[in-house]
Design a protein with these regions (language model features):
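Beta-strand-rich binding/interaction modules
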Residues: 214-218, 223-231
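Beta-propeller blade termini and top-face loops
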Residues: 1-204, 211-212, 221
Length: 231
């Protein structure tokens, strides 16, 4: 693919006309006037790569994320960066990622949570990119090319290369604040259940009786056995 093609564009929700654009020659530009003028902001990033994604933060006006990859030069290192000053300076948040990075998404409800799609699956960070964990959770280890958060349903939609589309409930992930993570164990709110007269009854003669169930979600900061009593 010849140089000169835009590969990613993102508009800040905090300011009309605050735009970021990435291209296939590794350059990232910012416009603060709706595209009338543009300023190069990728001078101190690795050069001659492909801007796989540029994403304005949904939590802070000055913050922007960028991911790069070097497919054309057989470079498969991970490149993920964040800027807290409109791209004037950048910090790498790639440590712990594997293979080329295709996309980065900031959680819409919790600014500490980031999702990254790589050529080797899905990753998550709970600390703004300081550390990363595999978040594939049973998904095949294939390239993840797109991620979208469905804010109303609190679901992460994952688009892969040749292995379909997946979704995962991230409602509890969004509740993993610093206060929750500091606890030894945390029990998330249990949804209310309304008793039904159909519980224990059969819908048809050869069917199984209806059996109610309840999911109980909790967070523990260490492996181990936990005993608890439900009253």
């Amino acid at each position: 693919v010849a140089f000169g093609t835009l590969t990613s564009i993102s508009e800040s929700k905090f300011q009309f006309g605050l735009l970021y654009a990435g291209s296939d020659d590794g350059k990232i530009h910012v416009s603060k006037d709706g595209g009338v003028s543009w300023q190069l902001i990728s001078g101190n990033l690795p050069q001659n790569l492909w801007v796989s994604r540029v994403a304005a933060s949904t939590h802070k006006k000055e913050r922007v994320y960028a991911t790069l990859n070097g497919y054309r030069n057989d470079i498969f290192e991970s490149y993920a960066f964040v800027s807290e000053d409109f791209g004037v300076t950048w910090n790498s948040i790639s440590l712990g990622l594997t293979n080329a990075v295709n996309i980065i998404v900031e959680d819409s409800a919790n600014e500490n949570v980031l999702y990254v799609g790589t050529d080797n699956g899905l990753f998550i960070s709970l600390d703004k990119g300081a550390t990363w964990q595999d978040f594939s959770n049973g998904m095949p280890k294939v390239a993840v090319h797109d991620l979208v958060i469905q804010t109303k349903a609190k679901e992460l939609i994952v688009g892969t290369h040749g292995r379909s589309i997946y979704k995962i409930d991230i409602s509890k992930v969004q509740e993993l604040t610093n206060e929750v993570l500091a606890k030894n164990i945390h029990l998330f709110k249990v949804n209310d259940r309304i008793k039904s007269d159909r519980w224990g009854s059969q819908n048809y003669a050869w069917g199984k009786p209806s059996e109610p169930s309840q999911e109980i979600w909790f967070y523990s900061n260490a492996d181990g056995v936990v005993n608890f009593t439900i009253t």
